[in-house]
Amino acid sequence: MKKKLLLILLCILQSVLFALQAQNTQRNIAYTDDNVRFTVISDGALRLEYALDGKFVDDRSHMAINRLYPQVDYKLKTRGGWVEITTSKMKMRYKKNSGQFTDKNLIITAAKEMLPFSWKPGMQQKGNLKGTYRTLDGMDGDTQTQTWVADTKKGEKLKLEDGLLATDGWTFIDDSQGLLFDNDKDWDWVKERPANGGQDWYFMAYGHDYKAALKDYTLFAGKVP
């Protein structure tokens, strides 16, 4: 009897915690019009969407499984034909009704207290801190010693892929081609995105606070299991 009562109480507590969590999260859409939508995930992370047909993606993607975020303080202004979204870490400016995001109509700059940067579409990081590699088969330290490994030749140095963080103080993620989940009630599965030329971007500003960057990333990509 005591075990059953304890189980019931735990279920009730879990339901209350889920309800409180839902109350403290929201979509945080800062601006939307016929073709663009900007979402403030945190003071250091933005989602930027362009859709020619005006059909924005609300389904979870293979990379971004969260669409609800904690409440964030930000300022929205529309002046001189530009949309401005300002947080404590960055300012984004987009020229209204100018089409897909390009280096001519979109710019994101660091806030005064942050490591300075000025980013436009197409810019590449200079100080990526690198990530991982598909396999270490045949490696002796950072040198390939075997001939049968497809990715590298014997004697070649290990070439790490770019990672999430960089000394530049910002990270750009393009999820425009990422698979989506179909929200099937019986078995959630992946599906392709509509071939409509849409853009689904994420931008993170963090300076040298890499711990904060990792936390911001988990807000939309999910926590480590």
Task: Tell me what each language-model feature is.
Residues 29-31, 37-39, 72-78, 83-84, ...:
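Short, exposed beta-strand/loop patches in secreted or surface proteins that constitute
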Residues 78-225:
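Catalytic and substrate-binding clefts that recognize carbohydrates or anionic sugar/phosphate headgroups
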Residues 19-22:
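Boundary at the C-terminal end of the N-terminal hydrophobic targeting segment
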Residues 8-16:
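Bacterial N-terminal signal peptides
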